[in-house]
């Protein structure tokens, strides 16, 4: 599927990080490169036959970047923060699809995190949610009512709207058709 193209995922994630932390184009490009390098290291390329391989975790991207000879700039600071907060796992056995995860009620308590970390987590969850919904066909309709597959609630969503996260805007405008 086209949505599995590494550059699509890398762009989504880099965009979320950049917007959450208020980064510019140069920093966005650096993050994008780090993600694409991790995909290449995992043997995942533009060739769709490689897309069944385990994708690199975001923690792997962060660790790999910080292990390198990098200048201590804004991207370094962001990745250090992500490493310190231990938001991501490096164990692919702990990773599930968004739909598997949402088979029951999930609550993510972000009260202890700094605002930019909260924004990043919400944005990444919504990115994955939207990408997986997009891969499904539209939900069934019966007697004028559309099937409700999943519900996602973002408390204080107005704080995220001003960040112009692409996935939140797309979910608001297109989400109904996916159920």
Which ranges hold each PLM region?
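P-loop NTPase motor domains
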Residues: 1-177
